[in-house]
Design a protein with these regions (language model features):
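Core catalytic loop region at the nicotinamide-binding pocket of NAD(P)H-dependent oxidoreductases
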Residues: 352-377
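A conserved structural motif in NAD(P)-dependent oxidoreductases
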Residues: 338-352, 365
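Rossmann-fold cofactor-recognition segment
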Residues: 46-66, 160, 164, 219, ...
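A glycine-rich helix->loop->beta "capping" turn
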Residues: 52-55, 74-87
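Catalytic loop of short-chain dehydrogenase/reductase
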Residues: 90-235, 240, 247-310, 320-340
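Conserved Rossmann-fold cofactor-binding substructure of NAD(P)-dependent oxidoreductases
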Residues: 62-78
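Conserved Rossmann-fold SDR core element
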Residues: 54, 81, 305-320, 365-370
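Canonical Rossmann dinucleotide-binding motif of NAD(H)/NADP(H)-dependent dehydrogenases/reductases
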Residues: 1-32
C-alpha cells in the first residue's frame, strides 16, 4: 500500500530502483521525458504481470519549472497519500536533440498504435495530457521565426517543438504535455548545424541508449567553456526541480486517512554524487556546473532535513557511487583497451544505495509487524545488504545511511560538507553504518 514517486526512472539507476520498489510491493509513479519508451521498458520485464498494475508513467521535463509545479498540483489532487520521493533524475552530460531523435516516432505516434498493456501504464498521463491540450490549436507557421521557415531547415519534430516553446498559450505546461518534443528544440548554435553522423542510427549502448560519438562533452568542460544554457539546465534538473517537488508535495506526504495515525517513516531520497562533496581531497577543474548543482542539492538536504524530520519525513542525500564513465566514447574505449578500466559499481549497486534508506526502515518495522507484511521489509533488506557490500568497494565516498538525531540525515550530509561535524556527532554516540 505504500506510494512512491521516482523521477528519472526510464533507464539505468532509476530504472533499477523502480523495479526494486515495484517488486517490493509499492505503488510507483515514474517521471521521464520519454514516457512511452519508459513504459515499454518496464513492460518487457518477465514478471511485469505481477506488478504492472501498480505502475504509472508520466512525461515531465524537469527543465520546465511551470510544468514541475503543474505536475505537483496534479499529484496533490490525484493521490490519497505519498510515502516516498526519490529525486533521481539528473543532468550530468547534456545531449543534443539528435541523441533522442530515435525515440520521437514512438513518442509522437497515435496512442491507439501503442500496445494495450503499455497504454495502461500511460492512462493517467495521457488523460491529463489530453485535458491540458483541449484548448490548444496548432500555431500558425507565422509564429515561427522567419529564419527557421525555409523548407528543409528544421525537421518536422523540431518545428513542432519550436511551436511548443514559442507559443504563449501552451508554454505553461509544455514540459508536461510535450516533454518528448521539447528534447528536440535546438538551444545551442551547433545544434542547428546537424550532427546526425555523431549519433549513428541503430547503434545503442548496453542501456539501450543512443551511442554518442562526439569528441568532447560536458564532462570535459572548464568553467569558461560551459554554455549558459547548460549551466541553467543543470541547476534546474539537479537542484531546482527536487526543491520544488520536496516543497510542494510535503502536504501530500503528511496526508492521512480519517481515523489513522500519521506515519513517521516517510522518506525523501535526494540522489547526489561525489561531485557535490566539499571534503573530497581530489577534485578536477572540469564540469564545475555539475559540481555546483549537486552541492546545492546537498545543502538543501542539510538545511531542511531537521524540519521534515519533525513531521516524520526522513530526508537524505545518497551518493550512488561510481557507476558510469562519463568521458566521450573514444576516451572511454581507449581506457578499456589500455587499462581494462570499468567503473567499480554497476546500475544495480547504485539503485541499491538509493533505496537503502527505505529498505532499512521497512526492515526494522517488519520485525514488529504481522507476518503478512514482513516480506516487504525482507525484500528491501536484500538491497541494503547489496548496498553495504558495494560501499566497501569505493572507500572515501559517502557510505551508507548515517543514523543521526534527525532520522538519518544529520550526520549523513555533514560528512559531505565537512568531516569535523561528523566526528563531533560520533563523540555524542551517533553511530555511522559503514
Amino acid at each position: 500500500g505504500r506510494v512512491a514517486l521516482l523521477t528519472g526512472g526510464r533507464v539505468k539507476i532509476g530504472y533499477q530502483a523502480g523495479l526494486k520498489l515495484l517488486r517490493a510491493g509499492a505503488q510507483l509513479i515514474v517521471t521521464t521525458r520519454f514516457p512511452r519508451d519508459s513504459a515499454a521498458r518496464y513492460a518487457q520485464e518477465p514478471d511485469f504481470g505481477d506488478w504492472g498494475h501498480r505502475l504509472e508513467v508520466f512525461g515531465l521535463d524537469l527543465r520546465h519549472t511551470p510544468s514541475v509545479e503543474a505536475f505537483c498540483h496534479e499529484l496533490m489532487g490525484k493521490l490519497p497519500r505519498l510515502d516516498f520521493i526519490i529525486n533521481n533524475a539528473c543532468q550530468t552530460v547534456r545531449r543534443p536533440p539528435e541523441f533522442y531523435a530515435h525515440m520521437m516516432e514512438g513518442e509522437t505516434a497515435a496512442l491507439h498504435a501503442t500496445p494495450e498493456h503499455i497504454r495502461k501504464l500511460l492512462g493517467s498521463y495521457e488523460g491529463l495530457r489530453s485535458y491540458n491540450m483541449l484548448p490548444e490549436s496548432r500555431l500558425p507557421e507565422s509564429r515561427l521565426p522567419e529564419s527557421r521557415l525555409a523548407e528543409g531547415r528544421l525537421p518536422e519534430a523540431v518545428a513542432s517543438a519550436m511551436q511548443v516553446a514559442i507559443g504563449q498559450d501552451i508554454s505553461e505546461t509544455a514540459g508536461l504535455t510535450r516533454s518528448a518534443e521539447l528534447s528536440q528544440v535546438p538551444l545551442l548554435a551547433e545544434e542547428l548545424l546537424g550532427q546526425k553522423h555523431l549519433f549513428p542510427e541503430g547503434r545503442l549502448d548496453q542501456d539501450l541508449q543512443q551511442v554518442d560519438l562526439r569528441g568532447r562533452n560536458s564532462w570535459r568542460l572548464l568553467m569558461h567553456e560551459v554554455p549558459s544554457v547548460e549551466l541553467l539546465e543543470t541547476q534546474l534538473v539537479n537542484a531546482i526541480a527536487p526543491f520544488l517537488i520536496n516543497a510542494r508535495l510535503k502536504p501530500l506526504m503528511l496526508r492521512t486517512e480519517a481515523g489513522t495515525e500519521p506515519s513517521r517513516d516517510k522518506h525523501i531520497v535526494n540522489v547526489s554524487a561525489v561531485e557535490g562533496q566539499f571534503y573530497r581531497r581530489f577534485k578536477t577543474t572540469k564540469h564545475p556546473h555539475t559540481n555546483m548543482a549537486k552541492a546545492a542539492l546537498n545543502m538543501m538536504t542539510r538545511t531542511s532535513a531537521a524540519d521534515y524530520y519533525a513531521d516524520g519525513i526522513h530526508m537524505n542525500s545518497v551518493d550512488t557511487g561510481w557507476v558510469t564513465d562519463e568521458d566521450p566514447a573514444h576516451i572511454a574505449t581507449r581506457k578499456v583497451a589500455e587499462h581494462r578500466f570499468h567503473p567499480p559499481l554497476d546500475i544495480v549497486d547504485g539503485a541499491a544505495r538509493i533505496v537503502d534508506p527505505i529498505g532499512r526502515t521497512l526492515a526494522v518495522r517488519a520485525r514488529h509487524c504481522r507476518p503478512a507484511v514482513v516480506d516487504v521489509g525482507l525484500l528491501l533488506q536484500v538491497d541494503a545488504a547489496l548496498h553495504a557490500l558495494s560501499c566497501q568497494l569505493v572507500p572515501g565516498q559517502l557510505r551508507g545511511v548515517v543514523r543521526g538525531p534527525q532520522g538519518g540525515d544529520s550526520a549523513d550530509v555533514r560528512r559531505q560538507v565537512g568531516g569535523e561535524r561528523v566526528r563531533r556527532d560520533r563523540k555524542r554516540g551517533h553511530k555511522a553504518v559503514e
